[in-house]
From Swiss-Prot:
One of its GO terms (biological process) is translation. GO terms for molecular function: structural constituent of ribosome. InterPro entries: Ribosomal_protein_uL29, Ribosomal_uL29, Ribosomal_uL29_CS, Ribosomal_uL29_sf. One of its GO terms (cellular component) is cytosolic large ribosomal subunit. Belongs to the universal ribosomal protein uL29 family. The gene is rpmC. Keywords: Ribonucleoprotein, Ribosomal protein. It comes from the Bacteria. This is Large ribosomal subunit protein uL29.
Length: 64
């Protein structure tokens, strides 16, 4: 998910996306621990998406 796409979301949508990404990260970590994870790069993608969302939320908070 690109930063531009994230900035177009509402605050509620951002929070929902963050929750979804955190759940996905949790599941990916379990798959990694059990040796079932094939695409390890997905871990990095999800972590970066969470960071992008948190950054956008903070920017909105500071702009108010």
């Amino acid at each position: 998910m690109k930063a531009k796409e994230i900035n177009e979301l509402t605050t509620a949508e951002m929070l929902e996306k963050e929750k979804q990404f955190k759940e996905e990260l949790f599941n990916l970590r379990f798959q990694l621990a059990t040796g079932q994870l094939e695409n390890t790069a997905r871990l990095k993608e999800v972590r970066k998406n969470i960071a992008r969302i948190k950054t956008a939320l903070r920017q909105q908070e500071l702009n108010k």
